[in-house]
Amino acid sequence: MKSIFIIIFILYVFQVNSQTIYPIDPSGKCEQYIGDTPSSPCSKFLNNLDSIYVSSNATQQNAMKKLDEYFGILGAIGTSGCKSDSLTYKTLCSIYLPGCESFTNNQTNITIAIPKRICYNTCNNVTTKCGVPKFYFSCDQIEPVSGLPMFPLNYSEFNLTNYDVGNPNYTVQCYGPLSDNTMVNLDSSYCPPPLFYHNSTDHDADYDRGYLFVSETSNCVVPNPVPLYTNEQWDQLYNLSNTLAVLSTFGSLYLLVTFIILNPKVTSFDRMYGFFNGSVFMMSLSGVILFIAGGPRALIKDGGARISVFEDPLCSSTGFIFQLFAINAILFWAYMGFDLWWRVKYITKPLNIQKYYVPIAFTISFIFSVIPLATKNYRMVRGNIHCWVHKAVLQNTLFFGPLGLTLTISTGFIGLVIYEIYKIVKATGRGGIMKLEIKPILNIVLIYFSFVYIFAFNFHNDNNSKNTYGSIDEFFQCTLESDDPSKCTVGGPSIGSLGYFIYCIRIYGIYCFFLQGLNERAFKIWKRSIVFNNRFILFIKVKLFSMDNNSPSESGNSSTTAGTSTTINNSNINKKNNNSKPTLSTMDSNAFSKNNDSDSDFDDYDPYHKKQNDIEIGSVNIK
């Protein structure tokens, strides 16, 4: 039993000793230093310029490229204490350009080379002083071939017996340079891609101009659009915003023209939705203005170095328009929710508060939009697609506060609407009321969930901003290791979540178009409007009827009849043209409908069909 323990102990000692012996690269060699690059002045900090170790799978040229990148990052985001210490540069240069010892076999004339590695404590002290995270560069990393520490505590051991040197445990002390007064003038204008250099003497003033510096001591600025996504993904988001803005503008404009301009009898219901649709139109128009100017990329200035701010007219104008009418839309949407509940609960009792509510809503919207205008706080939202209110305190006070309050109140009204409908259906056993209210309910609910998402998205991003900024180190690591740094991204909201946010701020006109604009009443308004009742349209109709009546038929009698009909029709039309201007009665309505509709189409609009539907609750008949 004792002998077994002795054998195990011997094997353990042998294994430990074998693990401390570093392998020798037979193709490794000692080379003379090839010289500094403009970004990496290592000649001041290397211990021996005549003996640099180069392994079989490395070159000094590749090492200098890596050093250029690290010197660039050091100049861009390094702390002043880190950049002013010569030990930082001695350590950095010696990691990628280690010292070298060589041995020659006198019999075979073969020369071998072994590196002089940086000491672990030196590496650890420098990375700690410079604030380098371990996942970015770790002094605990091991060499891939041997599995031994890349930075030994004291020395490295080599077995040189096979190279006629005769020492099986040859030791090379690790290199632990000391700080001295050697100074280095880094190229302060160099910034590693994709950062931009901006010569700044006042970071605070330049921040107000739209620049975002990576640190207080650096003149390197964050690129725009912010590398949350690749350029291709940003283009997809920009195209989504442009497309929805155009569609929403035309959808809301159609509703305004139909129910406010062409409509011969505008009801209070039309006016209520008109104020909301008008606000949506102007919100969407701000996106169209941006689209015409070149899309969201037009808000990015100086080749991507800065974002648009208040002093840029395109930004301040579109930001003001969006804020003004976004608040307006929120307030009128809240009124629509209250109006819907009132109509469901009281049915025939009118709600006459528009004349008070409208001026109050416009006043609130104007004040909440002028405040950021007066304080010059409209600027592009970094990592987004439009200009809007700057500073969290103003955003929360002038937008998200009112939005949160409105959502709270509207949630109550939506619940009350559902409850009232439930009571009516339960009392009558009929679901007709639900059919009557389905479109208004959908309109309220769809917009409600859009507002809720905007509210939640903003506060989620604010609460997780540290996670985004905390991934900047990983971003720089990617730029160093990637063949295409433009593919590197900073951690942040997923592209799907930002895409849905863009959808929510641009979709309202499309929602309203499908829920309000595609119905029989809208078609009748257009059919009887001046758009289809003017001399030009009348002339086209006459020509079309003439061509139709003069076309060949299967029998001569039919042709004669057609000709007679044409003569009569033309005679009647000419007679009426001489006596009066064309009106609906002078035209053949068959061009638009199979049936001749009466003027009763212009009776008071009754969107809830109160006149045509009797609702019985218990023994009471409500009309």
From Swiss-Prot:
The residues on the Cytoplasmic side of the membrane are: 265-273, 339-354, 419-439, 516-623
Q: Which GO terms describe its cellular component?
A: membrane
Q: Where are the transmembrane segments?
A: 244-264, 274-294, 318-338, 355-375, 398-418, 440-460, 495-515
Region entry Disordered, spans: 552-590
Residues with attached carbohydrate: 57, 106, 109, 154, 159, 169, 199, 239, 463
Q: Which residues are exposed on the Extracellular face of the membrane?
A: 19-243, 295-317, 376-397, 461-494
Ranges of biased composition (kind: Low complexity): 555-580
S-S pairs: 30-100, 42-93
Write down the InterPro entries for this protein, in alphabetical order.
Frizzled_dom_sf (IPR036790), GPCR_Fz/Smo-like (IPR050949)
Localized where?
A: Membrane
Tell me yes or no: is Membrane among this UniProt entry's keywords.
yes
- Where is the FZ domain positioned along the sequence? 25-163
Its membrane topology is listed as: Multi-pass membrane protein
Which UniProt keywords are present, listed alphabetically? Disulfide bond, Glycoprotein, Membrane, Receptor, Signal, Transmembrane, Transmembrane helix
Indicate the secretion signal residues. Answer: 1-18
Family note: Belongs to the G-protein coupled receptor Fz/Smo family.
The protein depicted here goes by the name: Frizzled and smoothened-like protein M
Question: Native species of this protein?
Answer: Dictyostelium discoideum (Social amoeba)
